[in-house]
Amino acid sequence: MNYGAADERWANPPQPVAAAEHGPSFDHSMVSEEYEHDKKKNPAQKEGISFSQALLASGHEKSDGKIKLTARSFMEVGGYAVFLIVLVYVAFAQNSIQSYYYSKVMSDLFVASTGASGAPAFGSCTSMDNIWDWLSQVLIPGIYWTETSNSTDNENMIYYENRLLGEPRIRMLKVTNDSCTVMKSFQREIKECFANYEEKLEDKTMVGDGSVDAFIYATAKELENLKTVGTIASYGGGGFVQRLPVAGSTEAQSAIATLKANRWIDRGSRAIIVDFALYNANINLFCVVKLLFELPASGGVITTPKLMTYDLLTYQTSGGTRMMIFEGIFCGFILYFIFEELFAIGRHRLHYLTQFWNLVDVVLLGFSVATIILSVNRTKTGVNRVNSVIENGLTNAPFDDVTSSENSYLNIKACVVFVAWVKVFKFISVNKTMSQLSSTLTRSAKDIGGFAVMFAVFFFAFAQFGYLCFGTQIADYSNLYNSAFALLRLILGDFNFSALESCNRFFGPAFFIAYVFFVSFILLNMFLAIINDSYVEVKAELARKKDGEGILDWFMNKVRGLTKRGKRPDAPGEDATYEDYKLMLYRAGYAEKDINEAFTRFNVTSMTEHVPEKVAEDIADEVARMTEQKRNYMENHRDYANLNRRVDQMQESVFSIVDRIEGVNATLQTIEKQRVQQQDGGNLMDLSALLTNQVRNRESAARRPTITSIADKKEE
């Protein structure tokens, strides 16, 4: 059988259309009417692109406006996917849930535990006496375990599994007694003044004869310490240090008792820092513990616990070789990207940096280079510190440099991962549906910038009001920084209304209601309106554009190709039945309802019969005719809807103009009426004046004869 006459129809099947019972859709017509005349009545099926064509293609735009997939874009997506996998492995290989559990166990032991004789927990210390009790009843028992295990020598071991590295250190920083000035009115009663901590106000004077190291000031260089950041201030690395023995709780208790008896912590003390390090061989993790007591000039104690867990011996484990391989691949990618960016900048000069995604690439490379440098530094620092601790016999273990290098590395690594995932939007935006987010943000950037200024004015006005009005009584408003974040939390529903009300029964509720009204109800809804307006515009604009063929389109075409949907159907063989031919037509893209109607018109009752050549051609013609008829109906209906919408818009415009004309006419009539009234009032005044003058003239004329007669009589 020869089906050559139907080959052209099969090679160029129509696009599937919606069933007639669903009715025409007006959604698309409402947003794409300006370009409806450019659409073809029977557009050809979107051309596909093979894998080999994708590799060999060059960037070009087809005559119908569709952008074809290029070799550069395909290779770029594939290469970046591999880079992202490598980056994620490098970033997360050294992080595990064990790090959290390790920190939590140590926190429960030293921070949350209370003393056997009623000593408060670390966070509950509020006075100097509480600090002494915590040191003797919580810290010492936690570090020195007296119970023994049959299979483990637990000397220097915490929980039988954590080795104590070096001597625990208790460091105290103090200020001089003349670091501030007492007011003259109180100088007779108050002789000493201790200011808040500043490094220039530190008291470095030796206490007593200096026979005990804890009473001799040691510099930061001698202790190998860095600054410690607290809640109130940042404290220097020096201070008066009491080293506890590696083993022996009795000696440690004796040292604490000696310090307490000699009033080692006094009025001038501003910080007590306890630091030590642990190593767990089971999970190959180090835990650096730093517990800070701050003693502000106002009195009391502010506690800050810091427990940081690190993997300092990554390359010495079973997965160390694999980690080195992935890090080497990561460095290779970064080197390739750097050369690529340099060539691009050389071609385009500074204009290259005007594109958003190019700036993202530059930032990503900058963070990546910094990560590589910091990774080398933290590895070198960690290994050197561990070797140093082992060489000195586990007596001295300052880990501040390790903590600093590790934190810097982790922070920059987090930035690299974040920017790398943001860049994924660059590739998924090749499809117009996926590009709506980025296009919406780009279009609304100017409006959001203006909104941000207005929001900042309102926000910081409320923040300053809260700080000034409630700062002395509510912790959330104790400073401007806390006040700003308290207001941000209020937007999310996290607030303490009772505290505001108890602080000020008038301004508290008024402040809360005003902030919720202006910020939550007005400003946030304005922000959503800006985003929504931009999204509607972007969606309408993208609906008017013709579909391009990007990475996602190429992938979906391959998936459709696997199911043979949208492909040219093979001509039915001699043994093909009506059921087979129906399936071929359906796979070619025709609507199932049109196929069934065509089969019904040709009185096809048995689907197992063979398809004659003539009947096959007639059925194909009928299905194509019905599909084309429906498409024309849809196009005409869409044109009618667009025309109807435009007429409605014109009507609204005309009615608006008429309303404005009527308003102007009413205004003119009012003005004319006022002018006439003013003119009538003026005429009445003129008439009244004229009548008054006439009356006066008549009265004068009437008086004259009388006066004349009187004068004549006098003369006589």
Curated annotation (Swiss-Prot):
Annotated stretches, region: Disordered: 1-44, 696-716
Primary location: membrane
Membrane topology qualifier: Multi-pass membrane protein
Organs and tissues of expression: Exclusively expressed in a subset of 3 categories of adult male sensory neurons: ray neurons, hook neurons and head cephalic (CEM) neurons. Expressed in the male tail.
Outcome of gene disruption: Worms exhibit defects in 2 aspects of male mating behavior: response to hermaphrodite contact and vulva location.
Intramembrane: 483-497
Compositional bias per record (Basic and acidic residues), positions renumbered to this chain: 1-10, 30-41
Record key words, sorted: Behavior, Cell membrane, Cell projection, Cilium, Coiled coil, Disulfide bond, Endoplasmic reticulum, Glycoprotein, Ion channel, Ion transport, Membrane, Phosphoprotein, Transmembrane, Transmembrane helix, Transport, Zinc
Subcellular locations according to the entry: Cell membrane; Cell projection, Cilium membrane; Cell projection, Cilium; Cell projection, Axon
Gene Ontology molecular functions: calcium channel activity; calcium ion binding
Residue spans crossing the bilayer: 73-93, 325-345, 356-376, 410-430, 448-468, 511-531
Extracellular topology ranges: 94-324, 377-409, 469-482, 498-510
Glycosylation sites: 150, 177, 377
Record flagged with keyword Glycoprotein: yes
Annotated domain remarks: The transmembrane domains are sufficient for localization in the cilium. The cytoplasmic tails are necessary for localization in cell bodies and anchoring at the ciliary base. Cytoplasmic tails also regulate sensory function.
Protein name: Polycystin-2
Organism of derivation: Caenorhabditis elegans
